[in-house]
From Swiss-Prot:
Function of the protein: Catalyzes the methyl esterification of L-isoaspartyl residues in peptides and proteins that result from spontaneous decomposition of normal L-aspartyl and L-asparaginyl residues. It plays a role in the repair and/or degradation of damaged proteins.
Name the UniProt record assigns to this protein: Protein-L-isoaspartate O-methyltransferase
Taxonomic path: Bacteria, Pseudomonadati, Pseudomonadota, Gammaproteobacteria, Alteromonadales
Organism superkingdom: Bacteria
Active site: S62
Organism: Shewanella piezotolerans (strain WP3 / JCM 13877)
Length: 211
């Protein structure tokens, strides 16, 4: 990361601290990640603003605050293996891969997946497994997972995902249509405890449609 980007990423991490993010490893990962590499060059000047930005195909790179917030919630269960639904630009995966030993990520849009793989390889992040497929179904053959993060809003919590959690595992997912709620769902045996975190806005999680 060049000096200007490094300074900008550090300033972004500081602004997230001021916004309420307190997990030091998360803030360090944000400070170490060049967000402009996950955007088209035309949007590079906005890379370190705390806002969501378009990445093509009707998708977005999430607001840095939400990336950090979802990550610190997920890390509360100290996961060893994590599944991400919605690779998108790869930015969220870049943050997670610095914080967990093993990351699996699923993307339904082939062009986005190819770009994300290239970006993450250039950042020397090699603890990531990629799948082109339907995020609603997760990635059963790689499971179970200690934690699952969904980066698009589902109309309801997908049973296929909760079933891929370990006992004590956590699903972090935005749920809803016009009004969306970020949920933390914890598996306790064959039961699931849901906790509402905050109001959010995400692109929809598409069921069964690849692009």
């Amino acid at each position: 990361m060049d000096r200007l980007a490094s300074t900008s990423a550090l300033n972004l991490a500081r602004s997230l601290y001021e916004a309420g993010i307190r997990d030091e490893p998360v803030l360090k990962a944000v400070a170490n990640t060049p967000r402009e590499r996950f955007l088209d060059a035309a949007l590079g000047h906005k890379a370190y603003e705390n806002t969501a930005l378009p990445i093509g195909q009707g998708q977005t790179i999430s607001q840095p605050y939400i990336v950090a917030r979802m990550t610190e919630i997920l890390l509360q269960c100290q996961p060893q293996k994590v599944l991400e639904i919605g690779t998108g630009s790869g930015y969220q995966a870049a943050i997670l891969a610095q914080l967990v030993p093993q990351l699996c990520t699923v993307e339904r849009i082939k062009s986005l997946q190819i770009q994300a793989r290239q970006r993450l390889k250039k950042l020397d992040l090699h603890n990531i497994a990629f799948k082109y497929g339907d995020g609603w179904q997760g990635w059963p053959s790689k499971g179970p997972y200690d934690a699952i993060m969904v980066t698009a809003a589902a109309a309801s919590v997908p049973n296929a995902l909760t079933e891929q959690l370990t006992d004590g595992g956590v699903l972090v997912i935005p749920v809803g249509e016009a009004s969306q709620q970020l949920l933390k769902v914890t598996r306790k045996g064959n039961q699931y405890v849901s906790e509402a975190i905050e109001i959010v806005r995400f692109v929809p999680l598409i069921n069964g449609e690849l692009a």
